[in-house]
């Protein structure tokens, strides 16, 4: 059986995780200037992201075996996409833009938490000849995703 597509999907999952973790902080000054959100409240966005991710990490360990790893990983990408889409629209349509940002953050943090907990064990369980290399490359994709989102954002924001 060929696990190449599984490996590529896992690599892309870590890129998605990097986007969810790094995109909103690049917008903090935009949130402050456009929506007049105080910087003290903006600092809560990262806290909400990581607390949500931690809660998902804890809960995921209990439920992934019952629900299934594939469903959970596909769900992680759907949550991440929905949260990022929400970040584009919810602050503009909700009466309180900050609540739109927080709701979006919680949604994409769920996806990020699922990715964090599930992707490494999936790659580890695949019968690759050079598993150590696959795992090293997997974790480098988070870095590449971070670099990509920062470079692309820099180009688009300038």
Regions found by a protein language model. Give the residues of each.
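Central cavity-lining transmembrane alpha-helices of secondary-active solute carriers
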Residues: 44-62
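Intracellular juxtamembrane helix-capping segments at the cytosolic ends
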Residues: 114-127
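Hydrophobic core of transmembrane alpha-helices in multi-pass small-molecule transporters
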Residues: 97-114
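C-terminal ends and interior cores of transmembrane alpha-helices
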Residues: 78-95
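Primarily marks hydrophobic transmembrane alpha-helices of the MFS/SLC 12-helix fold
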Residues: 70-73, 101
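Glycine-rich segments within core transmembrane alpha-helices of 12-TM secondary carriers
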Residues: 131-153
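Extracytoplasmic
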Residues: 5-37, 57-60, 120
